Each structure stands twice: as structure tokens, then as C-alpha cells.
Amino acid sequence: MKFAKIPMATIIRLSIYMRTLQELLEDDVDVISSERLAKQCGVNPAQIRKDLAYFGEFGVRGVGYRVNELVNQIKEILGLNRPWNLAMVGLGNLGSALIRHGNFIKHGYMFTAAFDVDPQKVGKRLPNGLVINHVDELEDVIKEREVHVGIITTPASEAQSVANQLVLAGINGILNFAPVQIQVPDCCHVENVDFTIKLDSIAYHLSFGS
């Protein structure tokens, strides 16, 4: 499914809508109005209708959205109607915690490779059954296990080198937790995660917000 360029804020909200709808499914909710969905997602109903309108017509006027149907439609829009294989590079405290987090599998993301340079970690088996490979093996393992997305949790000094290796291995999507901006070709999409930036926003609102 191909669409024109969509604002990133819309894509992020679609993820929020989908997770909220999945929670509603667990509560046996079959149909929901845009007003109720908006309230639970922290947006206004017009925003939901606008976001969905980028991709077609959804729901029934005066009735609302069929929850299961809308979940499946959003999954298709986001490309989540298929599994995605992940590789973790850097098994320090953060990387180890993330790779153990069950929420990834719940949403269709599966770790199929893990890498580190520490000889005390390389060769060890993780709770999910993965054996930690040395970073020197990255390209071969990435291709063998058909990894789609690389996650970097290395120190900043190593992040660019790891990004280069991931790109050479054919990876076009990187989630970067290292506290540094990495440079990649245009064909590779990078999402940077820096918790301190979120804290800066909170600090601002606590200091000057109403």
C-alpha cells in the first residue's frame, strides 16, 4: 500500500490509535465513536478523522468505527501486517533491558540477532534463546537472519561505526539510542531516541507552562 507523503505526527498518532484500539479489543469493545476514541487518545475527534482521511474512508457516520476492522486497517497502513526482524547492537544495561522486553513481540517485532564486542558477552545465550554474536560477524548474520531494522545502544563513540556496518549489511531502518547524531545515506531511515530531550520538554513546561 502506497500513500503520498504523510506528516510524521500523523504516523505517530496512528500508532497511538492502534494501541488504544487493541486495548479496547481486550475489553471486548466492538464499536467505538470518534469522540470516545479521541478522549482516550488525548486528541480531538476532528484530528482522528483528519488523520484517517489521508488513507481513505473509515467508519460509519452516526455509528463509529468497528474496533477490530480499524486495528487491521491501521496495521496495513503502518506496514504491521507482517513480522519485522530486529537486531540489537550493544548489550549493555539499556540493550539488555530492551531485548528482554516482551512488548516488542506483542506488536510484531522480533529480535533475531544480537551483537556486542565484549568477549565476556559474546557467545552467551540470552533468555529469548539468542546467542550474542561479535560485531565483526554483523554483516553475515544480518543477511542470514533477514534482519529489517537495527537498534543501536552502544556508547556514542561507537555508534557511527555500527551504523556504517548496518548500512553495508543492507539495513535501511535504524533506531538509535546512542547520544549522538549518526550519518547515513538517504535510503536509510533513522529514528533517534534521546530521553533527555523529552525531559527538557518536561522541564520547560514545569518552569514556564501554564
UniProtKB/Swiss-Prot annotation:
The answer, when asked if Transcription is one of the entry's keywords, is yes
Where, by residue number, does the polypeptide cross the bilayer? none
Q: Where does NAD(+) bind?
A: 90-95
- Where is this chain primarily localised? cytoplasm
Q: Which SUPFAM superfamilies match?
A: NAD(P)-binding Rossmann-fold domains, Winged helix' DNA-binding domain
Which Gene3D superfamilies does its entry note? NAD(P)-binding Rossmann-like Domain, Winged helix-like DNA-binding domain superfamily/Winged helix DNA-binding domain
Q: Which family does it belong to?
A: Belongs to the transcriptional regulatory Rex family.
Q: What does this protein do?
A: Modulates transcription in response to changes in cellular NADH/NAD(+) redox state.
| UniProt name for this protein | Redox-sensing transcriptional repressor Rex
| Gene for this chain | rex
